[in-house]
């Protein structure tokens, strides 16, 4: 049966892709079909995906725009594919990711197997102790502004399967159904919220930034998590030069450096007393700045360390307020812990990894709300 199809795609690959999508959960897309509704005719739905992808006739539906609030008060727009489309995207991702990921830089940490945000924070912490200056920058609307021609050039360099190339191009062109039900065509970018989008973002940034800076500034190590980047420098002059060079490089790649989220930082501590106006930066929910610490002999000194950011604390407190714990007094502590312990545990496991005493503020706030 498979031999009569245009493309040789195994049914087992589609099944494995579905299991990954199921594990990731997620909301319904434009067709309003939830994962549970999709599973009511699981065999038929998976066969339909396999049949259409194998014949070359699979056409991705529009992605559903969902706006979520950002910690800085802005709005982040996600593009949520349908469950069927998430399975189809996962099929391609599972096929191409192993070979592509092997090419990525060791200091690319976002959305990669075996990599994590905490690894990026820890590596940045260690480098801040060794190097005095940091260039921190963010890319304005990175997912929404990736140039399709440049991206597909990178994709074709790594992906040779014709059907994978065909569907990647179709996903890039899939329109967006906005919150007011307007269908907007897509001419650039890859929707943040798509299954394959993080891999495409990493591939684009691999050539736009990682390879470039490794060649032009090999003595300036970096940590990148998607479009959030920190680069370490030996001097203020080097940092100033590099910030300008990065801005130019991004423009060449048709991206824009975020004007208010890009800066030069001095990693001040007891051994680095230089007067410089900017002595802190926030990376992946942690604010790096001078903090009191004890050395091996128990003596107090100032070190440059990460701790949970005020923005992250504010976001967590806001979430706790929505639980309305004070009006749920009839609930037993066991019931409350069953409901909220998984969330709290995740927060403390992440933000408590570095300078954990800062998380006492959240623990105290939670106690007041009970």
Language-model-detected regions and their locations in the chain:
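Non-catalytic terminal/accessory segments
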Residues: 1-370
């Amino acid at each position: 049966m498979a031999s009569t199809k245009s493309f040789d795609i195994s049914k087992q690959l589609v099944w494995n892709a579905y299991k990954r999508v199921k594990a990731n959960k997620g909301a319904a897309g434009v067709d309003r079909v939830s994962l549970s509704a999709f599973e009511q005719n699981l065999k038929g739905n998976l066969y339909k995906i396999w049949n259409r992808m194998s014949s070359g006739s699979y056409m991705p539906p529009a992605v559903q725009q969902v706006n979520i609030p950002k910690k800085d008060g802005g709005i982040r727009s996600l593009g949520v594919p349908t469950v069927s489309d998430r399975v189809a995207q996962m099929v391609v991702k599972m096929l191409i990711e192993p070979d592509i990921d092997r090419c990525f830089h060791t200091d690319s940490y976002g959305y990669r197997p075996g990599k994590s945000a905490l690894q990026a924070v820890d590596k940045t912490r260690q480098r801040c102790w060794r190097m005095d200056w940091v260039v921190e920058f963010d890319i304005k609307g990175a997912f929404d502004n990736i140039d399709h021609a440049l991206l597909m050039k990178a994709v074709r360099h790594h992906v040779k399967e014709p059907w994978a190339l065909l569907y990647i191009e179709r996903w890039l062109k899939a329109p967006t159904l906005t919150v007011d039900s307007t269908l907007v065509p897509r001419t650039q970018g890859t929707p943040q919220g798509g299954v394959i989008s993080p891999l495409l973002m990493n591939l684009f940034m691999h050539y736009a930034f990682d390879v470039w800076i490794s060649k032009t500034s090999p003595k300036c190590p970096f940590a990148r998590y998607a479009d959030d980047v920190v680069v370490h420098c030996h001097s203020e002059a080097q940092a100033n030069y590099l910030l300008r060079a990065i801005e130019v490089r991004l423009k060449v790649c048709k991206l824009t450096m975020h004007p208010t989220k890009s800066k030069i930082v001095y990693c001040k501590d007891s051994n680095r007393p230089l007067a410089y106006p900017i002595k802190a930066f926030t990376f992946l929910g942690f604010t790096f700045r001078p903090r009191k610490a004890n050395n091996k002999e128990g003596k107090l000194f100032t070190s440059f360390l990460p701790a949970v950011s005020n923005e992250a604390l504010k976001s967590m407190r806001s979430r706790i307020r929505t639980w309305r714990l004070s009006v749920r007094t009839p609930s037993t502590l066991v019931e409350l812990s069953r409901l909220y312990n998984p969330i709290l545990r995740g927060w403390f496991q992440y933000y408590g990894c570095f300078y954990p005493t800062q998380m006492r503020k959240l623990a105290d706030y939670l106690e007041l709300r009970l």
